[in-house]
Amino acid sequence: MRILNYTIINLVMSKHLLLNINKTQKGIIHIIGIGGIGMSAIAEILHNSNCKVQGSDAQSNDNINKLQKLGIEVFIGHNANNISQAQIVVHSSAIEFDNVELIAAKNNNKTVLHRSDILAEIMKGKYVIAVSGSSGKTTTTAMIASIFDHSGIDATVTVGGILNSYKSNFKLGGSDTFLIEADESDGTMLKIPAKIAVITSINNDHIDYYGTFDNIKNAFSQFVNNAGSAVLPDSVDIDYDAGNSITFGFENGSIRASNIKQHANSIEFDVLNNWIPALRAGMTKGKCTEMSSQCVTLGSSPLKNIVLSNAIGIHKVSNALAAISVAIKLGISDADIKKGLLEFQGVARRFSLIADIKGVKLIEDYAHHPNEIYATLTAARSITKGKVIGIIEPLRFARIRNFFDEFIRIFMMFDYVILTPVHPPEDKPIPGCGIDDIQKALISNGFNNTKIMNDALLISHFISDSTSPSNIVLFIGAGSNIAKLAKETAALIAEVKV
């Protein structure tokens, strides 16, 4: 991968700073929020590129522990002094404008880069497959990675979750192929120089950034048209170059799933392929090559008896169709596609089984948008006729405000709902959008099976007293608190039920 030979001068914007770093070769890159799932991957990439990297975060976590083991210095807590030796300061949209390090960087004329800018620089000259969408990005990227791993493509992979096969959110590859999960929440995907742009789904999330749903659709349209080669659901309503794209779905897509069978921890299905290129792309010594823009539609070429391991729910089939579409575009063989999906090990916190205690399954899922929570609930219903209890950590007051009625409607589909505090804890409350407001709305609509809890011991007692074999308890949310509650609760229940 050529980035290994890059110097730090390739990763900055300022010409003045370029000269300074070129002379010293000792420029330090400071990453604010380095423990985040995306920022920690950037830190690893830069570290493996022989750049001197450091960073800071409000608290330690597993990502930070891993970075520290690599020799990367991490400051716990934000302080202006943390960036005193840095020449470049990198931040994401999650960092508030009043962050003391960000302010200090600007006041001291440091080069300040957004995450998207440094990613764009890192990927220049690479063969980039970028996966974006309102939901399903992480799982789809992980499935593509698994197919690559079983087809000779040694790609660098960065993803917004911990892949069970890598035990990491990052894998350094040995080729120029770069597979990345591209964040749509702040328009980052528009700066990624993708050869193939993948859209998993589009919904009206992140309205606070985009303003309108039309703006969201226009951004995704720009994303795929920038790439010139696209993979997208057959249901999306955006403008794109249809001549150089593959659509996937269950009814009208060029790549369609049929004969879907849900098993205990896998899904079996067939795929009809109506997209056959005039010139199949191929791999030359493990390197991706560009697909011809010309394609013809011939008779369906079925791919039979695909087994997707570690997957529950129809939405996982949709993710797999996107991954299969990318593989078909690259000319990967049917056998390698099937092998990659059969060996798929899943992603942490994506319908992940934490414990099965005397027939009661405790499952963790990252869902935080109403559509995602509904998909998670539907997946649970597909494997049990018993009760499904949701322990739910809402993500941000603004999202509660934007989707309040949708949350109420979907929460009422559970047998019981326990609400935990809104994540992140520093999020500014919005009147009428707290968990107590959600509970009141549920009760006023006739749904009385709801509590507010934030203590693993209390939750464990409730689950022990209220569940029986074949019941499922879903820990739902994107924050760190719900993940901690899930692990602690599982341990406590195991002690009680032994």
From Swiss-Prot:
GO cellular component: a single term: cytoplasm
Molecular function as annotated in GO: ATP binding; UDP-N-acetylmuramate-L-alanine ligase activity
Disulfide bonds: none
Binding locations of ATP: 133-139
Keywords of the record: ATP-binding, Cell cycle, Cell division, Cell shape, Cell wall biogenesis/degradation, Cytoplasm, Ligase, Nucleotide-binding, Peptidoglycan synthesis
Pathway(s) the chain acts in: Cell wall biogenesis; peptidoglycan biosynthesis
Extent of the signal sequence: none
UniProt-listed GO biological process terms: cell division; cell wall organization; peptidoglycan biosynthetic process; regulation of cell shape
One Pfam family per UniProt: Mur_ligase_M
InterPro entries for this protein: Mur-like_cat_sf (IPR036565), Mur_ligase_C (IPR004101), Mur_ligase_C_dom_sf (IPR036615), Mur_ligase_cen (IPR013221), Mur_ligase_N (IPR000713), MurCDEF_pg_biosynth (IPR050061), UDP-N-AcMur_Ala_ligase_MurC (IPR005758)
Reaction(s) the record says it catalyses: UDP-N-acetyl-alpha-D-muramate + L-alanine + ATP = UDP-N-acetyl-alpha-D-muramoyl-L-alanine + ADP + phosphate + H(+)
Enzyme class: ligase
Origin superkingdom: Bacteria
EC number: 6.3.2.8
Statement: the UniProt record of this protein carries the keyword rRNA-binding: no
Listed SUPFAM superfamilies: MurCD N-terminal domain, MurD-like peptide ligases, catalytic domain, MurD-like peptide ligases, peptide-binding domain
Subcellular location: Cytoplasm
Job description of the protein: Cell wall formation.
NCBIfam families in the record: murC
Family: Belongs to the MurCDEF family.
Descriptive protein name: UDP-N-acetylmuramate--L-alanine ligase
Organism, scientific name: Wolbachia pipientis wMel
Source lineage: Bacteria, Pseudomonadati, Pseudomonadota, Alphaproteobacteria, Rickettsiales
The encoding gene: murC
